[in-house]
């Protein structure tokens, strides 16, 4: 059982060992999996039974761990659909550039299997950024992204957090993402093991021995078990 609240404008990072329940939680939040109990409340509204589309309409944005592909749809069209309005080339280029893509090469390409997993991941993140959602959920946004693009993505998250005051939930093993958080929630065995600030939680994650904590942290390009 997991129970937590995300405040307006808060950045919450969820981390923990593989198989601990992070992605399952993300799928529940996104509406991919159906909850067997409890409720999901957004601005006082019970959205537990909402479909993915209806949750998006209610103000929730998602970036999945495995981005869907859209044969026959251009990247520009995909961004416009995500924004809920027709976007011009300049706006599309700005969105794509903010996630580390050379924009002019992508806006008229199809968002399909001709793009790599890392490219699709960044395009999907750009679709979330195309609209001012009440809350955005990013499931392992660093997956498949090169270090240069990841640095740009970090700056983008920091900018959103500072300027737009959107609530952000990031599920990640990446230390740089973990350290950005207002709060960190550690999940293991389907339960909340710890909640606190980066100053409180990061030393615990790095300080415990592997046998006493299952936490898996990514530092730079390498993975560390803690």
Q: What are these regions, as identified by a protein language model?
A:
Residues 46-61, 205:
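ABC ATPase NBD coupling module
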Residues 140-141, 148:
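Walker B catalytic motif
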Residues 38-45, 91:
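Conserved ABC transporter NBD signature motif
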Residues 66, 72-88:
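Q-loop/switch helix immediately C-terminal to the Walker
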Residues 15-17:
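The feature captures the beta-strand-to-loop junction immediately N-terminal to the Walker
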Residues 30:
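Helix-to-loop junction immediately C-terminal to a conserved catalytic motif
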Residues 128-129:
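ABC ATPase C-loop
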């Amino acid at each position: 059982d997991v129970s937590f609240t995300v405040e307006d404008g808060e950045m919450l990072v969820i981390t923990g060992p593989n198989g601990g329940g992070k992605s399952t939680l993300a799928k529940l939040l996104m509406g991919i999996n159906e909850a067997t109990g409890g409720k999901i409340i957004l601005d006082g509204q019970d959205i537990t039974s909402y479909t993915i589309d209806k949750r998006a309409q209610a103000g929730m944005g998602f970036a999945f761990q495995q981005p869907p592909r859209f044969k026959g749809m251009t990247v520009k069209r995909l961004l416009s659909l995500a924004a809920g309005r027709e976007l011009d080339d300049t706006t599309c280029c700005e969105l794509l550039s903010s996630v580390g893509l050379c924009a002019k090469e992508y806006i008229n390409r199809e968002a399909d299997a001709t793009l790599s997993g890392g490219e699709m991941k960044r395009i999907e993140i750009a679709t979330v950024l195309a609209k001012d959602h009440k809350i955005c959920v990013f499931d392992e946004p660093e997956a498949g992204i090169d270090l240069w693009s990841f640095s740009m993505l970090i700056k983008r998250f920091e900018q959103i957090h500072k300027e737009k005051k959107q609530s952000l939930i990031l599920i990640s093993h990446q230390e740089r993402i973990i350290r950005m958080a207002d709060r960190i929630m550690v999940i293991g065995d389907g339960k909340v093991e710890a909640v606190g600030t980066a100053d409180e939680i990061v030393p615990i994650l790095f300080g415990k021995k592997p046998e006493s904590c299952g936490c898996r942290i990514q530092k730079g390009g390498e993975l560390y078990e803690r």
